[in-house]
Curated annotation (Swiss-Prot):
It comes from the Viruses. Keywords: ANK repeat, Repeat. It comes from Acanthamoeba polyphaga mimivirus. It holds the Pfam family Ank_2. ANK repeats lie at residues 55-84, 103-135, 136-165, 167-193, 195-223, 260-290. This is Putative ankyrin repeat protein L121.
Amino acid sequence: MSLRSYMIYDEYNRKYISLYNYRTSFFSQQEKSLFDKIKSEIVSDDDFVIYGTDCKKYFLDYCILKNDLNVLDTLVLKYPWHAVIFDHSVSDFLVNSDGLVNIHQYILNFISANKIDHYEDILNYLLSHNIDISGHDNIAIMIAVQRKNLSMVKKLVEYGADIHANNDRALKLAVDDIEMFQYIVDMGADIHIDNDYCIRAATLIFNFDLLQFLVELGCDINIGNGYLLRTIINADFYYHRTITKNNVFEIVKYINVNSLGPHELTNCIHVHKNIELIKLLSDYGADFTFINKFCVMNEYEENVVDILKNHGLKYESILKFVLKYQSFMH
């Protein structure tokens, strides 16, 4: 195969433009005009040969990006694509047993790997051509779940897509979308998959609505010897403010607070300064007695306290000063 078969000719500048290492996300105006010219002149498969074998693949990419479904239909249905297997970027599993490229799988892979706002149109296009939407590890429904498109997920299920494929992977993809998650659970997904992955993930992304939903369904909130609560308590200040806003205290009531150590409890006092949470943890049995040992005064500190008391300072004022100092040091 000649080098020219991987190029298209720019008649205006009288030179060939290579498409071999071309990246579809960076179509220049010049390439766009050339693609428009090609599109207007497609009357037979021979036209692709004139412009180069590799042009087929990139023209397909371009049609997907531009949502040009009419031309996409022409490319997929009317012309053989056997020559595109010479393109090294097409994986072997995209080639059917007869040596032809699986175009539908290629399209699904392409929209999965690229952020395409109109992907729903393309999925509908594939459905309209009666393809096996559950094939290739159910990539179509995984795309819809990742894009948080519940209506498309339901439609794909109606067409035979398996919402439970790959060990309920769709459920794990939906941990940041409570509505999608609830739908998949209603379809029979296992909320305990992969050692309670869902409740762990919900904790890490601070999805408290999902946390409460999972607890109500029977997930073990004390999983990992207090992993959930320790993760929340050790969160940075921004997320800790979110805790109060999302009423996570209802969840804390069911947690064994004895899993918290001095590090977490010190964070509550000095870093987060969340008085509601400190009170709640104390009411539910958190052990703050480490402070007694931590705050044992040496001779110098006792002398300082005595001097301050003799000058009329109250214990409350001295304590407030110490707390402010500790807060500053943190």
